[in-house]
Amino acid sequence: SGFVFGNNVNQDFSSFKIEDIKRSSDTNSYTFVRESASVKESKIISFQPENYFVEVKHIIRNLSSEVINSSSYSKIERNSLKPPGTEGAFFGDPANFAYLGPVFSTESDNYQKVNLGELEENDFKENSIKGWTAFLEHYFLTAIIPDQENINVFVGKKNKTNEKFSVGVVGRPIKIQPFEETSFSYSLYFGPKVQSELSKANQDLPLAVDYGFLYWIGQPMFLAMQFFYDMVGNWGWAIVLVTLLIKVILWPLSYVSYKSMGKMRQIQPQLKDLQERHSGDRQAMSQAMMKLYKDEKVNPALGCLPMLLQMPFFLAFYWVLIGTVELRYAPFMLSLIHI
């Protein structure tokens, strides 16, 4: 991160050198400085031991007698390789279900996936006042949350020189008057996809916890699981309780299915008799079966349809279980069994 300067600036910068270190019980700050004949740039990086946020502030001072044209920028890079441990059979590793790659949140789309293949073909560029960008992994992410009051340009591209992919933010153009200074700040998040932590940085950052296309079902399930965890203090039992809750909610559908299957079992002898009687005439057998269903008030579809209607709920719950970092290595019972 830093500043992009116009042609009127001497680009012969010294390398960043540490100038100051400040430590306290809640924040550790490190100040780095570099300068050229025209400008002096300071970078202040602040860490808080209790969370995963990094606050970065850049200060630029014009040392010349000319106006300097500049823009701020911040970016993160990665290669195209999958993180260690994500290779293997599709059904063998939950990480293979997770989206790994760049994400942008802007005013036009608060959660937009732009995979590495797309950046191979075309750069991403979009103006927005609010938003963030990140690289996602299965349980972790690295995100840039810029100033939310000015227009920024969110960018993503592949560097053809080093074959690395980058996402970042470029600030609006500014003019720095002679012997004056300006600054810009942004936040970084390096850590697990813990929704309660992500929401502290940006209201849309919890969307990085990706429960797939059934997010609208999965998110309430996670909130229910969080509620039960707060009650019992154990994620394993929270999963059991959510499973029971889902079964209770879906019981009317299950009841219809079980009732229909019970009726089908009762008329099995009659169906078998019809099949033997009309074994040589499929049309007659079909008509006889339809008449039997009507007389006995049996709908064969009611045995399968309610089960199909329940599938999205169980699929969404599966996505929640494999995508929630709080469950990673969490003890189930007496700390002897881990999820």
Residue positions per predicted region:
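Helix-loop-helix
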Residues: H58, S71-D93, D147, N162-F165, ...
